[in-house]
């Protein structure tokens, strides 16, 4: 059943009956009680992101990685951060994946991207409450782009703490 659901992802869009991918949803639920199921599902979802799948399928995969993803998923998600069409999908997952790898990917995007993509990455650091990003966010307060400065200030406020307040 799971193999069939992943096969259905290759042609998935939001008009596809959700029953076609129900086995993936079921595996995501089962993954909370079984580390082996979680790792297997995570690897399959990562592999799916590497395929030529629709934006809707990438959205679905990123939502599942937000539930079951760990450090192994970060490189695949980070590769989407520079895409206008997919950045927010990846950020949604990276905001929820615990660990420094996800935070580092977002911090890198916050300093290396520009425009809306950069602002989104900055905001995601605030959503995570990423105290390790305070130095990065503080440095962005000196940028010329007022929206970058505003986003960095808002994220620092979301993170809170003495170090953020002193920035």
Each language-model region and where it sits:
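N-terminal "cap/leader" segments of large eukaryotic alpha-helical scaffolds
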Residues: 1-21
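Catalytic-core regions built around general acid/base machinery
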Residues: 44
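Structural detector for internal amphipathic alpha-helices that build alpha-solenoid repeat scaffolds
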Residues: 14-36, 47-51, 55-70, 76-79, ...
């Amino acid at each position: 059943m799971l193999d069939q659901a992943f096969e259905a992802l290759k042609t998935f869009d939001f008009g596809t009956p959700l029953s076609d991918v129900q086995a993936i949803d079921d595996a995501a639920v089962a993954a909370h009680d079984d580390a082996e199921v979680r790792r297997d599902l995570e690897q399959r979802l990562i592999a799916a992101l590497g395929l030529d799948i629709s934006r809707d399928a990438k959205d679905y995969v990123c939502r599942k990685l937000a539930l079951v993803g760990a450090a192994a998923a970060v490189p695949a998600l980070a590769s989407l951060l520079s895409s206008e069409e997919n950045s927010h999908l990846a950020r949604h997952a990276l905001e929820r994946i615990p660990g420094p790898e996800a935070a580092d990917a977002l911090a890198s995007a916050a300093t290396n991207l520009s425009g809306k993509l950069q602002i989104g990455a900055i905001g995601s650091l605030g959503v995570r409450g990423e105290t390790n990003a305070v130095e990065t966010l503080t440095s962005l307060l000196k940028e010329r782009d007022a929206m970058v400065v505003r986003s960095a200030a808002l994220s620092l406020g979301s993170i809170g703490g003495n170090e953020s307040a002193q920035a």
